[in-house]
Amino acid sequence: IYTPQRAQEFLEWSEAFRLSLNELFAARDVPMHANGMGSIIAIHFSRKPTTRTSDISAGCQALRPLLHMELLREGILICSRGDFFLSLPMTDEHLSRARDALEKFIDRHKPLINEVLRAHA
């Protein structure tokens, strides 16, 4: 049953995941960040905060199809525009798999990410 307590727990769990992604991006020194609120999380290719659609660069838009396809290859469903939508049936294992897939993506494509963003600056 979706009680107010369960809603708060879900919000905190979702926010912790988003923060963990930003910690990953910072630790890997990659120009990416996750924003959103609660169960809606958007991945952006930028070091600057994204607060409106005009903040989304051409480089970010160019990299999103690669992120989408790479995460799908890892079994992670993400929207083609870089959005994650968390849901109540998901577990810590689901989020761990998503984070691991993002880590692989960074390891595989960090030089390309930087080059694409430079080319579109």
Q: Where are the regions a protein language model picked out?
A:
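Conserved N-terminal phosphate-binding loop of PLP-dependent enzymes in the Aspartate aminotransferase
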Residues: I1-A121
